[in-house]
């Protein structure tokens, strides 16, 4: 289990100067050719998503104005807060800030031939399904994960096992991504 606080994470500026990324984790850890990766991006200007052949990207708007995502003849989609949207990361996708204000989003990318991610918003106590990995990010409220208290802009990632997240207040929201291996794959094969 690895814990993080978005306010204390290192920031990588994009080459096109349209935004920045905070990498949460990758699997396998510290590998350039990852099977899955979680990150938080701040988008300050219109531009294109980086291409990642063979990957699927699920993007979830965390804050800021809505974002229009366009991919040639494939789709035009308005990204709204806390509504995950998946697309192939090997296609050119343009992002346009609809309100002209900076947006922040959560990204999970998975290798299409190895694993599959799901992203949900939780508003009550729950237990993960025992996947190959997962990431949680607190949108608001106070949540207990094991012996650790997580509050707004904090989270955790793991590479295996079942975990219970307890909401400690009457209300709270947590972004939760669970990654599952496709048939014939397991974490033991890649570490």
UniProtKB/Swiss-Prot annotation:
Pfam families cross-referenced by the UniProt entry: HutD (PF05962)
InterPro entries per record: RmlC-like_jellyroll (IPR014710), RmlC_Cupin_sf (IPR011051), Uncharacterised_HutD/Ves (IPR010282), Uncharacterised_Ves (IPR023482)
Disulfide bridges in this chain: none
Protein family (similarity comment): Belongs to the Ves family.
HAMAP family: Ves
Name the UniProt record assigns to this protein: Protein Ves
Native species: Escherichia coli (strain 55989 / EAEC)
Lineage, highest ranks first: Bacteria, Pseudomonadati, Pseudomonadota, Gammaproteobacteria, Enterobacterales
């Amino acid at each position: 289990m690895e814990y993080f606080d978005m306010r204390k994470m290192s920031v990588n500026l994009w080459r096109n100067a349209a935004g920045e990324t905070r990498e949460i984790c990758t699997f396998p850890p510290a590998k350039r050719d990852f099977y899955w990766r979680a990150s938080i991006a701040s988008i300050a200007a219109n531009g294109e998503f980086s291409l990642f052949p063979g990957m699927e990207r699920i993007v979830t708007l965390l804050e800021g104005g809505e974002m229009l995502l366009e991919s040639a003849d494939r789709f035009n989609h308005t990204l709204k807060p806390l509504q995950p949207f998946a697309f192939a990361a090997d296609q050119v996708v343009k992002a346009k800030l609809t309100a002209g204000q900076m947006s922040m989003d959560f990204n999970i990318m998975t290798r299409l031939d190895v694993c599959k991610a799901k992203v949900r918003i939780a508003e009550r106590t729950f237990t993960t399904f025992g996947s190959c990995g997962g990431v949680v990010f607190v949108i608001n409220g106070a949540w207990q994960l094991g012996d650790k208290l997580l509050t707004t802009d904090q989270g955790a990632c793991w590479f295996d096992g079942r975990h219970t997240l307890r909401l400690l207040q009457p209300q709270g929201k947590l972004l939760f991504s669970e990654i599952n291996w496709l048939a014939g794959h397991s974490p033991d094969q890649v570490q």
